[in-house]
Amino acid sequence: MRRRHLKGVMAIERQVYPRPWSPNLFLSEMSELRNRTYLVAKIGKDVVGYGGIMCYGEEAHVTTIAVDPEHHRKKIGTRLLHDLVQEAIRLGAQATSLEVRVSNWGAQRLYSQFGFRPVGIRKNYYQETGEDAVVMWADNIRSAGYREQLERIISRAPEGIRP
């Protein structure tokens, strides 16, 4: 993700989140090059999705991931999550975590394909609605078995979505 992508990112952010991040928050996150990575998915010149991950030692955390609602069900989220997990592995993580709304079953299904398992609930995590978050973890992401799982997931994606 670069500064020039922020207009497209913010358009998606405002569509999918009741309390969107500010452009300044994205810029701040993007400036932490040592342990954070932010990616965009594009169709032509249009930003259609984005995601971010931060790594501390052997743990990584997906900070955000979103796809333009007009482009749901096109495996864009799959590709973003694949690339974020690959980046976590590159940065030395052994495990990665995320939070997801308890009502967001579609995202939970996607995350479970990547080996994320629910480990707890954060009560009232989403302040704007009071909704709880499911905390999910994927362990042993550096293992050969997990890497094979990543390869199977991405090999089923359409050609334009593959690395």
PLM regions: where:
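Residue-level recognition of the GNAT/N-acetyltransferase active site
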Residues: 2, 68, 72, 99-103, ...
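Acetyl-CoA-dependent GNAT
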Residues: 3-72, 81-91, 139-143, 149-163
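Short glycine/proline-centered loop/turn elements that form peptide/ligand docking sites
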Residues: 81, 104-107, 124-129
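Conserved catalytic-core motifs of GNAT/GCN5-like acyltransferases
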Residues: 97-99, 112, 117-134, 147
